[in-house]
Amino acid sequence: MSTRFTERGVPLVESQSLQLIQSASRLNDVITKYLSQRLVEKSYTSITPSLLSFLSILECGVNYGSEIARNLGVTRQMVAKTVKELCRLGYLEQINSAGKQKEIHFTETGEYLMSDARQLLSEVDEILFKNLDRKPKQIISELNMIAYAVNEKQHT
């Protein structure tokens, strides 16, 4: 393990974990930006990388703002604002249900948007995995094992 130093001489230990996190983040940013650009070309209006990332965590059926907020680690107000924008754009709709909560559903346009995004991702698969020795499932499994190990360490 090597160590670099800041201008003031503070040691900075090299970290493969940091490199992994930065590479994964960069890959996520590049793919999400590519998808949003391609979807805009397909006439899906105003679909930004951040809105696309938000949509990607939703279930195909019923969603609730509180569950979305919990999964994303954000406030319900932030979720409500984003859902309102996606409803305005025609990708989501809110339906009154029992109690205060509203059900959040994809509209037909929203379902087509997600279908087209998945199709574009399958095309990205060709680029990502064509020159690799290992199978995508193996890489995904290894990344999940890393995430599990870090999560376990957090709770011990």
Language model segments and positions:
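N-terminal leader segment of winged-helix/HTH proteins
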Residues: 1-45
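Alpha-helical linker/hinge and terminal dimerization helices associated
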Residues: 20, 24-27, 31-38, 72, ...
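Charged, amphipathic alpha-helical coiled-coil/dimerization segments
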Residues: 5-7, 84-141
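C-terminal regulatory/oligomerization modules of transcriptional regulators
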Residues: 1-12, 135-156
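N-terminal positioning helix adjacent to the helix-turn-helix/winged-helix DNA-binding module
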Residues: 16, 47-51, 109, 135
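N-terminal helix-turn-helix DNA-binding core of bacterial DNA-binding proteins
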Residues: 33-78
